[in-house]
Amino acid sequence: MVMNIRVLTPDRVICSTTADEVVLPGLTGQVGVLDGHAALITALETGLLRIKLNDKWTPIILCGGLAEIDRDRVTVLVNDVEELTDIGLSEATQELEKATLAVENAKTSKERLDASVELKKATARLEAVNYLS
């Protein structure tokens, strides 16, 4: 059986499709969702949303938000998404290393916070590259 999933930002619909399985980047770890899942509202971390349909995974990088799950429907409300570009494995790895160094070298709380968000995005990009290759 399939479920419906919608990913929405404040200004647009990112996707509205069906899925066999959805994996969300929850605050305490990944949240796997199958058809018939118990009702749940959960906060989302910056990270990789994965949508599986017909044995094919589609990754979407989310920038924080909420998800509402209700049996056969998943609604994801996010601040923003990052478009997946044609980035290669080596480039994604370099971005992750650069983001890791930025966190280590941050001098102020704001720099550390900004760098940690970029680190989460870089990690999600690398995961996305692995799903696309």
From Swiss-Prot:
Name the UniProt record assigns to this protein: ATP synthase epsilon chain, chloroplastic
A Pfam family it matches: ATP-synt_DE_N
Function: Produces ATP from ADP in the presence of a proton gradient across the membrane.
Family membership: Belongs to the ATPase epsilon chain family.
Membrane topology: Peripheral membrane protein
Compartmental location: Plastid, Chloroplast thylakoid membrane
CDD domains: F1-ATPase_delta
Sample GO molecular function, one term: proton-transporting ATP synthase activity, rotational mechanism
Species of the source: Phaeodactylum tricornutum (strain CCAP 1055/1)
Subunit structure: F-type ATPases have 2 components, CF(1) - the catalytic core - and CF(0) - the membrane proton channel. CF(1) has five subunits: alpha(3), beta(3), gamma(1), delta(1), epsilon(1). CF(0) has three main subunits: a, b and c.
Gene: atpE
